[in-house]
Amino acid sequence: IFGICFIKNITPDIMIRKNKPKHFKKKINPIVVEAKGLPDNVRIGYKDVKIKYVRPDYKKWEMTDCFGEYDYRQNIIQIQHDLCGQERANTTIHEIMHAAVQVAGLNQEKAPLEKPEFEEAVVNQLTNVMMGVFRDNPWIVDMLKNQLDESE
């Protein structure tokens, strides 16, 4: 499970208990908030991943400022419901990048992003750079969509 967190640049699974495997982590049930006009799923490789907008419970999450989280076991991206547009966009792409890393197997044993801190650093840096590219070059998203629709 990975997410955007701002406590010493570490991910939630590292923050819980260092001696407990992350798949034994306490079940977290944040409150789902209805989000009209926002997507509720995204296709990443072969996976259809659900997107939920949640009211975080920082006490249970044992964090002070986590904007989103990707849980590959539940196949879900959770995004804090009350983020401003820029933070929501950045968090969405950030969590999609975590899912892409998992689908591509880049965080498996002996893979380049095996260590969670490596994955978080790469995902964070690439997300921030690409969000700048999209913001500063608004034509690029439309061009990519148009080019993907062309078959020849």
Regions found by a protein language model. Give the residues of each.
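Active-site recognition of the HExxH zinc-binding catalytic motif
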Residues: 90-102
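N-terminal leader/targeting signatures
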Residues: 1-2
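Polybasic, lysine-rich low-complexity intrinsically disordered segments
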Residues: 8-9
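Metalloprotease/metallohydrolase-associated module, dominated by Zn2+-dependent proteases
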Residues: 16-87, 103-152
